[in-house]
């Protein structure tokens, strides 16, 4: 599973505020909410929360891609996330 490999890398750094760690946490929350919404389609409050978390993760990924493209590519590949479209 992807989670174990990423956790080992992040726990070595012990940087809870790093962009990678925040994106990792948001990705876990997104996956949990997505599975919840498959069962509860009319849970609109959770849908709103999911959209907010998606926006936060998108902003963090945009920041990381501007600052360090190599770390961005590694994180995208580790978490199995699609690359965001840039304007």
From Swiss-Prot:
User: What family does this belong to?
Assistant: Belongs to the universal ribosomal protein uS15 family.
* Keyword Plastid included in the entry's annotation: yes
Write out the GO MF terms. Answer: structural constituent of ribosome
Determine if Manganese is one of this entry's keywords.
no
Q: What are the BP-aspect GO terms? A: translation
Location in the cell reads: Plastid, Chloroplast
Give the originating organism.
Answer: Nicotiana tabacum
SMART domains in alphabetical order: Ribosomal_S15 (SM01387)
According to the lineage, what is the superkingdom? Answer: Eukaryota
- Taken from the UniProt record, the cysteine pairs bridged by disulfide bonds within this chain are none
| InterPro entries, alphabetized | Ribosomal_uS15, Ribosomal_uS15_bac-type, uS15_NS1_RNA-bd_sf
Question: What HAMAP family does the record point to?
Answer: Ribosomal_uS15_B
State the protein's name.
Small ribosomal subunit protein uS15c
Predominant localisation class: plastid
One GO cellular component term: ribonucleoprotein complex
Recite the UniProt keywords alphabetically: Chloroplast, Plastid, Ribonucleoprotein, Ribosomal protein
> What's the subunit arrangement here?
Part of the 30S ribosomal subunit.
One Pfam assignment: Ribosomal_S15
């Amino acid at each position: 599973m992807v989670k174990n490999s990423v956790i080992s890398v992040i726990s070595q750094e012990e940087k809870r505020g790093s962009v990678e760690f925040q994106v990792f946490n948001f990705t876990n929350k997104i996956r949990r909410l997505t599975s919840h919404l498959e069962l509860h389609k009319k849970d609109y409050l959770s849908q709103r929360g999911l959209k907010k978390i998606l926006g936060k993760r998108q902003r963090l990924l945009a920041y990381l891609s501007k600052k360090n493209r190599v770390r961005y590519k590694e994180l995208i590949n580790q978490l199995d996330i699609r690359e965001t479209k840039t304007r």
